[in-house]
């Protein structure tokens, strides 16, 4: 089994977000990418990426970087995020050294570029994943180690770019299949009542099936709606399904998350 196939085998057989992320981070470091930032939203609109609590955001960037980039809202003007939202595929960061391109940026975009330079985020690649939904979008930022130039990482990409792209695509697709909480964890009972409602059962039916009173079922549905930040139970069923928190096999973890910077995003 080649190292490429072995990595895909490990990724596709991983059972938690944490396992997938740690496997992927370790492999990308082998290619010279020592800082990685992955993001996915199902709530994109024309001028927004949706509520940050609804994103899947994984990063090995420093807390200092994350607190400014997300905490101070720089991501809203980040040129490569804008590129990723409008395109599919791969983009080298070589464009960021083009004087004409830099001259075309807004003041807010130039601030992001200057901040990235100050944090040694200057060489790398962005991969924007294809989506069939106009509201969904995922992308990954692969940042080269500080001692590598864009020429260095372009040489790596010339030799291994196809392999790196496929590994990132598989990582993305695997993450989409795993349960995750995004700061909105449901209790076991909340999942149970949502599952029965999702199966078309009424509150009375659900109460009988679970041996509860209708009032208790209503309470758990209300708490589930509050946790998921939705107005209706139908919305709650949809969002829980988006998070892959519905109909879990016993023993599946919905709480395992990669270690990442805790950032308050305004």
Identify the function of each model-found stretch.
Residues 25-30, 34-130:
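Regulatory input/activation interfaces that engage signals or partners
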Residues 1-8, 17, 138-187, 195:
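Juxtadomain coupling helices with adjacent low-complexity linkers
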Residues 220-223:
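Residues within the DNA-recognition helix of helix-turn-helix
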Residues 10-23:
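Signal-transducing coiled-coil linker helices
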Residues 225-266:
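Basic, Lys/Arg-enriched C-terminal extension of HTH/homeodomain DNA-binding domains
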Residues 116-145, 150:
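Extended hydrophobic
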Residues 179-216, 265-266:
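Helix-turn-helix DNA-binding segment
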